[in-house]
Amino acid sequence: KIWKSPIEGSLKYRHAAPVRMKKGTKYPLLVFFHGAGGRGADNKGQLIDAGGLSAFEKMGLRTKLNSHIFAGQVPKGEKWVNVSWSLLGHKTPEISNSMRMTMEAMDSYIQNPKNQVDTNRIYVMGLSMGGYGTWDAIHRRPDFFAAAVPICGGGDKSNAKKLAHLPIWAWHGEKDLVIKPSRSRDMIDAIKKAGG
């Protein structure tokens, strides 16, 4: 699908409804932010980047969890969050076009009653560049998501207090050569210091 923004631009995205839906029942939604390898214009890269969503499907988790899945695709040369991955920290920048349009398209999807989305069970996860996207999404909407799984990302530590209530399961490989593992550790430490 293609989302045409009422503000400016368009975004390619994929969504999948729960495998089994019953009228009147609400279902969880997983918003997925792909890594740099998923960028492009084919509306497929976000599904196969680093095994992300394709692994989710192969393991049977979509059927088991019976949830909606929503995944936008960042065009080549752009990012979910406009910051350098080599930095040891950053302040939340102006929202990127891809993040803005993903939020617009996601909101439209959620608000459509035929999709039967449970607004108390909206989860977000992403890897690498998408880990940054996950942190950015929860910084911008700390009360919107039920939980977050940022994998190999980094965020703005000054937002830690507003994230202290949110269940976060952060992952980062110690040998990551692209994004320093300290980016994830520093975020979790800041959230713990803020009471999380």
Protein language model regions, located:
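A domain-start/cap signature at the N-terminus of enzymes
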Residues: 1-29, 67, 101, 125-127, ...
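Gly/Ser-rich "nucleophile elbow"/oxyanion-hole loop immediately N-terminal to the catalytic nucleophile
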Residues: 21-25, 79-128
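Active-site machinery of serine-nucleophile hydrolases
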Residues: 29, 36-100
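Alpha/beta-hydrolase
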Residues: 31-33, 151
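The conserved beta1-alpha1 loop
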Residues: 33-35, 172
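Short alpha-helix in the alpha/beta-hydrolase fold that links the catalytic acid
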Residues: 44-46, 180-190
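Primarily recognizes the serine-hydrolase "nucleophile elbow" in alpha/beta-hydrolase
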Residues: 111-164
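Short beta-strand/loop motif that positions the catalytic acidic residue
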Residues: 169-172, 176
